[in-house]
């Protein structure tokens, strides 16, 4: 890839995408206000961009929400039902089958785009070698709530554990930069990627409120495997505000989410390779987390003990992720062993 000094892709192979589909997958009426605002803002930015395309709302096996979402349908917005397996990956794969544009953008149903979001997200695709681009997400706390002790923040304003609530975290790039994978709440793919690398793994990712993940990580690793010289870029100027529901401020959500992340990482490792699936995580665990732990610990005297809570959050999150990772590997190997025994019984020599 070639870039000019300003960080914008440049060169003889530039080609800005002329068409885009923005996909918003939804599963619950509890997020109706966020869904409504996000879809309308995405449609507004798409219209102002002058590009061909649509906003596609995919409802995940919820007839009541499907009927309500019909209110969003209009000249630039279509509403369809998930025809694949229940879950976020199935909804995204349904949308991929409907889209007929150069680029497919994925926006979470509780994320609201900031001005310039879409244009900044599409800038990297001016370089034909770029196949995937992702933007940033900043938390929008519940009304009247502040950042909880369980999600300590660095001086940059980002928290080491903000990924737990689907937001950009400390250690991620602050300018346009290559990354291993993008974040699911704000990302875009060239449509041709799905022809070569395949779709989202439907046995990965969220199903309703079950906080599994890593489906976009696994897909990005597959993209790199099929296209070794292709670009996957992070563009932090493409920004969404990600709503954080009150239940995600609690300690038990931190532990449930990090445990589930460990299980998801184990699944990705089994599908890809240890090096590919954990390269980013090793740097994060050995550089970013220790620095955050020390910062919180040293701040305890002047923060009336709040820093102790932050330090505990970082350690406990790492421990729960590790436990989930081990449990995930054990479960995968047990299922494989069970399947092997079944096959042997069904094919006696």
Predicted feature residues:
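Short, well-formed alpha-helical segments that are part of the catalytic scaffolds
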Residues: 29-46
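Short aromatic/hydrophobic "clamp" motif used to bind/position activated sugar donors
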Residues: 104
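Active-site-adjacent helix/loop segment of glycosyltransferases
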Residues: 230-317, 321
């Amino acid at each position: 890839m070639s870039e000019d000094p300003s960080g914008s892709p440049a060169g003889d192979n530039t080609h800005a995408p002329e068409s885009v589909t923005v996909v918003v997958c939804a599963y619950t009426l509890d997020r109706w206000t966020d869904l409504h605002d996000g879809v309308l803002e995405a449609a507004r930015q798409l219209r102002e961009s002058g590009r061909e395309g649509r906003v596609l709302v995919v409802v995940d096996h919820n007839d009541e929400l499907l009927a309500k979402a019909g209110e969003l349908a209009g000249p630039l917005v279509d509403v369809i039902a998930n025809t694949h397996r229940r879950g976020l990956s199935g909804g995204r794969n349904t949308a991929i089958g409907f889209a007929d544009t150069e680029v497919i953008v994925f926006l979470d149903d509780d994320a609201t785009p900031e001005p310039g979001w879409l244009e900044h997200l599409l800038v990297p695709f001016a370089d034909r070698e770029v196949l995937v681009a992702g933007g940033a997400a900043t938390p929008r706390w519940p009304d009247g709530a502040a950042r909880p002790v369980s999600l300590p923040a660095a001086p940059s304003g980002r928290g080491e554990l903000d990924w737990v609530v689907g937001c950009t975290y400390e250690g991620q790039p602050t300018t346009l930069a290559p990354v291993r994978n993008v974040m699911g709440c704000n990302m875009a793919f060239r449509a041709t990627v799905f022809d070569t690398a395949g779709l989202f793994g439907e046995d990965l990712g969220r199903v309703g409120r079950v906080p599994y993940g890593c489906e976009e990580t696994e897909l990005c690793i597959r993209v790199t495997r099929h296209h070794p010289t292709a670009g996957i870029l992070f563009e932090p100027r493409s920004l969404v505000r990600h709503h954080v529901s009150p239940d995600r401020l609690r300690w038990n959500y931190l532990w449930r989410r990090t445990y589930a992340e460990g299980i998801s990482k184990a699944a990705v490792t089994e599908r890809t390779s240890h090096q590919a699936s954990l390269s980013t995580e090793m740097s994060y665990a050995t550089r970013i987390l220790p620095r955050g732990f020390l910062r919180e610990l040293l701040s305890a005297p002047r923060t009336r003990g709040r820093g102790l809570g932050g330090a505990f959050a970082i350690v406990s999150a790492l421990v729960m992720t590790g436990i989930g990772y081990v449990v995930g590997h054990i479960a995968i190997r047990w299922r494989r062993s069970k399947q092997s025994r079944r096959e042997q019984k069904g094919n006696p020599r």
